[in-house]
């Protein structure tokens, strides 16, 4: 068994060599970016999985042999720098018509759902580069996305005919978790790459069988800029803990929030009846229950990740597309995505599962639409449904949208939760209309 494991850990000749060609500065530089197709290829190479579904069981059995190579403590692992995990990836939409067809919409815009898939794959590869052992090929770690903390759109001018570039690196490290900062740029007519979005993902390392936690290499900042990034990672962790502690699933709304719900309730009472039971909808308003859209997908092997679970990027794409359709149907015009935040991957989705998505508008303000998507799965053999994800998307419409009114206490909690996510959004941006981002 051990000999077989050593055979699997042969010297690596084909993997990325991180740290080479980087120069310290406000942004790291590399000699040659990866093509977007190489990202998944590198992940398969690092994990050592088969590209053929029928061989997946054998490939996973081989990974069991790597369990003995996991470190017993983080102290035995060499510290890494942010430059060690830095990667640039090119999405050549301008020069590859076949690839462009995968990303273009009927309105000649870019499918943001595809961008979410690319960000998820890039985040995992960045973490493998942080933990890469130069003398080995296959990694004993199983690195998975646990949280999409925030994706902020800083420019909404994505053209399907101009190249896109992604960059990413590890910005904070705990014992078994890592925060990844990623940016996206697009080439413009001035031959310069302009920023499009900033993304923060949280990844966790697990053992070779993806059954328990595993230690990751510590991170050492090299300068003040990196120290600030690392401190921000600590603050993000504290913020997430505080947000979870104050969840409406755990504690009652604040007094201010209770007043908001009561005012909404009073606004919907019929003045003719003077009764708590008679409800009417105010002008230019919509009941929350009337904004729902649902979808069902069968999770085929084609959508699996390198660990033979359903690819997290696929789940995000399907959720986003349903959310966009919900916002479009509600607002009456094509919406623009502004922010994606707080996507927690609570449970893995197995191949063969039935994926149920339910989307609804839960909060609106002026031109903004806050959409929540609930994801749950069931197996073909069981009727039991389990929640896997809750997605939060903030959209902006070209025109002012109707107000949302809840009817029940449960819907009132969804309203307050949506309001909280909306308020956590960065400063509202002015959206450009030349190439809006669509699914």
From Swiss-Prot:
Disruption phenotype: At the age of weaning, deficient mice do not exhibit any discernible physical or developmental abnormalities. However, in case of excessive nutrition, deficient mice are protected mice against increases in weight gain, excessive hepatic glucose production, steatosis and steatohepatitis.
Transit peptide: 1-21
GO terms (BP aspect): acyl-CoA metabolic process; long-chain fatty acid metabolic process; short-chain fatty acid metabolic process
EC number: 3.1.2.-, 3.1.2.2
Highest taxon of the lineage: Eukaryota
Inducers of expression: Expression increases by more than 2-fold following induction of nonalcoholic fatty liver disease (NAFLD) by either high-fat diet (HFD) or genetic ablation of leptin expression.
Assembly behavior: Interacts with NYAP1, NYAP2 and MYO16.
Function of the protein: Mitochondrial acyl-CoA thioesterase. Catalyzes the hydrolysis of acyl-CoAs into free fatty acids and coenzyme A (CoA), regulating their respective intracellular levels. Shows a clear preference for hydrophobic short-, medium-, and long-chain saturated acyl-CoAs with some activity also with short-chain dicarboxylic CoA esters. Regulates both mitochondrial lipid and amino acid metabolism.
Protein name in the entry: Acyl-coenzyme A thioesterase 9, mitochondrial
